[in-house]
């Protein structure tokens, strides 16, 4: 199945799986999705992920979701930049999510990274989504 916005699809799959208290969720594989999941893993929002190769040649990513006291670690996950309205920001104007308790995930010339990493690297970019 082809999706026009793979990041929104990934976010929706994670949100829906956590509402149903699923421990794992699968999504079609891509380098961009893997990069986004690597940021979520390094920030502690998911336990991990694994890429699964099928004999047909396509790949899937299995995401292991994270819970604390039975509640999902991700309270809110919202898409910011959409195909119809791209949102770009400079390093000076990077948004703080819930006063620094959450993160913004950005696509920068140096790769996909969290907002604090972008500040350290002094780069701006496209704000993909926010997590709290």
From Swiss-Prot:
InterPro entries: Ribosomal_uS8, Ribosomal_uS8_CS, Ribosomal_uS8_sf
GO CC terms, sorted: ribonucleoprotein complex; ribosome
GO MF: rRNA binding; structural constituent of ribosome
Gene3D superfamilies: 3.30.1370.30, 3.30.1490.10
Keyword annotations: Ribonucleoprotein, Ribosomal protein, RNA-binding, rRNA-binding
PROSITE patterns: RIBOSOMAL_S8 (PS00053)
Iron in keyword set: no
Pfam (any one): Ribosomal_S8
Listed GO biological process terms: translation
Family label: Belongs to the universal ribosomal protein uS8 family.
Main function: One of the primary rRNA binding proteins, it binds directly to 16S rRNA central domain where it helps coordinate assembly of the platform of the 30S subunit.
Quaternary structure note: Part of the 30S ribosomal subunit. Contacts proteins S5 and S12.
Protein name stated in the entry: Small ribosomal subunit protein uS8
């Amino acid at each position: 199945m082809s999706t026009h916005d793979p990041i929104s699809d990934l976010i929706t799959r994670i949100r829906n799986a956590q509402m149903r208290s699923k421990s794992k969720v699968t999504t079609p594989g891509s380098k961009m999705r893997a990069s986004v999941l690597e940021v979520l893993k390094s920030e502690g929002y998911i336990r991990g992920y694994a890429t699964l190769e099928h004999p047909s040649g396509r790949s899937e990513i299995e995401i292991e979701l994270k819970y604390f006291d039975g509640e999902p670690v991700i309270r809110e996950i919202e898409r910011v930049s959409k195909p119809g309205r791209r949102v770009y920001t400079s390093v000076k104007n990077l948004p703080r999510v819930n006063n620094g308790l959450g993160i913004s995930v950005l696509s920068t010339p140096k790769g996909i990274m969290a907002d604090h990493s972008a500040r350290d690297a002094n780069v701006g970019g496209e704000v993909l989504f926010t997590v709290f």
